[in-house]
C-alpha cells in the first residue's frame, strides 16, 4: 500500500508516520512524505502512485490572514487537482472545529472541506474531513497553538504560566487516539459523519484550563513528593505521558533520599494514593534487618540481587519459618500482618530487595512494633 502524507513533518504528521512505520509489515507499505521542503513537482508523481492520502498540511498561525487561503485552500485545491488526474485515491483531511465559526481560519478550513467534497463527487473517491478540537501529545510545538504543549514545556522548566480563566472549558483529543482512528479509517473502519459531512475523533476529553494547570503542577511536584498520579484516569495518564515528553534532555533524572547507615540503605521510590509505596532496601553482608511486626500493614519483598533468608514468627508463637531468597531465583515473599519478621544477608555481596507496602509510611502512625524473630 502506498500512502501519501502531506504535512508529515508537523505534529500530527510525525506521529502518524511513526505509527505507520511501526504497524504491520513495512514491506507492504510505502510512505510518501510531502513537507514544505519537498519539491512541488513531486506532488504530481505521488498523486499518480498513492493508494490513500492523509492530507494534514495546513496553516493555523500565519503572519497575515491571506496565508490561511494559501495554506489551507490553495494547497488542498492543488493536491486534489493532482489526484483527479492521478490515482483518485481516498483522502482523509484534517480540518478544525473552528470550521463552524465565522473567522478567517474557520472560513479557510470550510473552503478546504468543500473542495474535498467536490473531489469526492467528481471521482466517487471516499473522503473524510476530520474536524479536530485541540490535539495534545508528544512533539507538539510549545508557544505556538497548543496550551497543553506550552504549559508542559514551561512547567517542566519552572517557567511561570499564565491562566487567565481557570474555569475556561476546553475539549481535547490525544494524539495516539487521533492516529489510531485515522489508521482505522484507512483500513476500512469508519465512524458516523455529522450533518456537515464531517467526522470527529471518538475519544475526547473535556476539562478546564485550570484543571490542566493543576495536574501539570502536580506532575512537577512528583520529584519531591514521590506521589505518582492515578493512571486509571485516561486523561491523567495521557497528560502525564505528554508532560514527560517535554522534559529538558538534561532533566530526565532526579535524586532520591537514600537513608544509609553501616547496615545498608533504604530508599523510597514511589508513593501512591491507593496502591501503597515502593522502595528499595540494601542490606550489607552479615547484617539482619527488620525484627518488627505490623497490625494491618503488609508488604511484599522481592530480592533481586544477593543471597538471604527471610524469617517469620507469629506474634505469641514459637515456630520460626524461613524462606531462602536470592537474585538467582526471583520470587515474591508476602509479609503478613501479625508476624514479626527479619531479612538477613547470608552472602558475600549486598542483598538488594525491592519492597512494596500496602500503605505509604506515616511517621505519626507507623504501625510498626519492634520484636525479635
What are these regions (language model features)?
Residues 252-291:
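A short glycine-rich, His/Asp/Glu-containing loop-to-beta-strand
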Residues 77-113, 120-123, 128-130:
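Conserved Rossmann-fold NAD(P)-dependent oxidoreductase catalytic core, especially the SDR/UDP-sugar
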Residues 184, 188-258:
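Mid/C-terminal beta-alpha module of Rossmann-like enzyme folds, strongest
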Residues 314-337:
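Short acidic-glycine-tyrosine-enriched beta hairpin
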Residues 38-86, 98-102:
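NAD(P)H-binding glycine-rich loop region in Rossmannoid oxidoreductase-like domains
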Residues 3-22:
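N-terminal Rossmann NAD(P)H-binding glycine-rich loop of SDR-like oxidoreductase domains
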